Curated annotation (Swiss-Prot):
InterPro entries on file: TNFAIP8-like, TNFAIP8_sf
Cross-referenced PANTHER family: PROTEIN SALIVARY GLANDS MARRED (PTHR12757:SF1), TUMOR NECROSIS FACTOR INDUCED PROTEIN (PTHR12757)
Superkingdom of origin organism: Eukaryota
Record-given protein name: Tumor necrosis factor alpha-induced protein 8-like protein
Family to which this protein belongs: Belongs to the TNFAIP8 family.
A cellular-component GO term for this protein: cytoplasm
Length: 188
């Protein structure tokens, strides 16, 4: 019966998540995020657009990233995560940082790319993130997480992106530089 009790805080939290997710465009996001993160999103957009050849799909993917980050930020700011979920968040952070370090290494050192390893690392990050947010987000939001991780875990994208003569080489260099900067400043 306690589940049916009206709580203003819950309504307020849902309203914040809804409003912020509706405002999730690259330009709005730039007012909430630093220059390095904005640059990273712009370069991820370029990579998505180059890979898919579809501007709308690339925009949707970046909007999904922004919506996910905003919603997680709202949940964290409102202390919605349990101690166990915060521990899982630390696990996600470690896994995601390992994925980022692998991306940097595979880009910077030719012929070291390991598709199976990177796909496994991306999939583990996805599972870790969903284990934190599943109780708090809708199925639609969880689907957004899957879309983002599935796109970036795609074998064709990864194999193309990490070839030494990749058509994505220039944008991958910018992405790697952005990841390096963001990791140094603790932004991701």
């Amino acid at each position: 019966m306690a589940d049916n009790v009206f709580k203003s805080q819950d309504i307020g939290l849902r309203a914040q998540k809804k409003i912020l997710s509706r405002m999730a465009t690259k330009n709005i996001a730039k007012t909430f995020i630093d220059g390095t993160t904005a640059s990273l999103l712009d370069n991820l957009y370029r990579l998505c657009k180059m890979h898919t050849g579809n501007k709308a799909k690339a925009e949707k993917l970046i909007k999904n990233i922004i919506k996910i980050v905003i919603k997680i930020g709202v949940l964290h700011r409102n202390n919605q995560f349990s101690d166990e979920e915060l521990q899982r968040a630390e696990n996600f952070k470690r896994k995601f940082q390992n994925t980022q370090l692998s991306i940097i290494s595979f880009y910077e050192v030719d012929y070291t790319f390991d598709l199976a390893y990177l796909q496994k690392s991306i999939a583990e990050s996805q599972v870790a993130l969903k284990s934190i947010v599943q109780p708090h987000l809708t199925d639609k939001s969880l689907g957004r997480i899957d879309e983002v991780f599935d796109f970036f875990g795609d074998a064709v994208l990864l194999e193309t992106a990490f070839k030494p003569d990749s058509p994505y080489r220039e944008v991958m260099g910018k992405i790697v530089a952005d990841i390096n900067s963001a990791m140094e400043t603790g932004d991701i």
